A protein has these predicted regions:
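Short, solvent-exposed aromatic-acidic interface loops
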Residues: 169-170, 197-206
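Acidic, glycine-rich flexible loop segments
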Residues: 129-179
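Short, surface-exposed coil-to-beta transition loops
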Residues: 94-98, 149, 177-184
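Secreted/processed peptides and extracellular or luminal domains of membrane proteins
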Residues: 40-41, 50-52, 155, 179-183
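Short acidic-glycine loop/turn motifs at beta-strand connectors
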Residues: 189-191
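Extended, low-hydrophobicity segments enriched in charged/polar residues
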Residues: 14-145
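Boundary at the C-terminal end of the N-terminal hydrophobic targeting segment
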Residues: 9-11
Length: 206
């Protein structure tokens, strides 16, 4: 399985004010101006360049939660529901630049590609997965498409909401063949408290 990493903790509500839409050429200019730096210097440089390029204080504040190396480019929010979907862009990643985060619940930020939140044990017990693993011994789990259309929340029968997210099974590497598709459901209670993640389906590519 590929190991997927999550964000640092935070306690601030994410609102539309935290969204940043760089103007034409702005992002390329910001990236180029900080590209020779690393670590904290890179983060500080990128956050400062965001502010100079017109990003709001909330947008810069969100970037600083990720040590200045990510920003929100869209927020799917229903005021009637506690949990929103933040579309987060990582400009310095080589791959998987776009990510989805479930925000404003408890915990406040959940990276849907963070392995700690995924029902990996249930996936590995699934007969279809075990059969696929016999065919592809180097099978790894990767994020699915994290595009501009985020997952739509569905009300749970006992209250709260569910977000169903798609993933890909690959024959080892990021550029290797997709050999299966997985869906996990993230469940929250009425207050936005994260309950658990469930395996919804595992489908091999035929």
């Amino acid at each position: 399985m590929a190991i997927l990493f999550g964000p640092p903790a935070t306690a601030e509500e994410v609102t539309p004010a935290a969204v940043w839409h760089p103007g034409p050429g702005s992002l390329a200019s910001v990236r180029a101006g900080c590209a020779d730096l690393g670590g904290k210097e890179l983060g500080d440089c990128f956050a400062a360049a965001m502010a100079k390029a017109g990003a709001s204080r909330a947008a810069v504040g969100f970037a600083q939660r990720f040590e200045g190396i990510a920003y929100i480019d869209a927020l799917d929010r229903d005021v009637a529901r506690p949990v929103a979907i933040a579309h987060v862009f990582f400009p310095y990643r080589a791959n998987e630049n776009s990510a989805w985060f479930l925000v404003n619940g408890m915990p406040e930020l959940i990276d849907v590609d963070d392995r700690r939140y995924l029902a990996v044990d249930a996936l590995e017990r699934a007969p279809g997965y075990r059969a696929l693993l016999r065919r592809y011994p180097e099978l790894t789990l990767w994020p699915g498409l994290r595009g501009s259309t985020g997952p739509q929340p569905v009300s749970r029968s006992h209250g709260g909401e569910r977000f169903t997210i798609g993933y890909r099974l690959r024959d080892l590497c990021h550029a290797c063949a997709v050999v299966g598709h997985v869906r996990f459901a993230f469940d929250f209670d009425r207050s936005g408290k994260f309950l658990s993640t469930r395996l919804v389906s595992m489908t091999p590519v035929r």
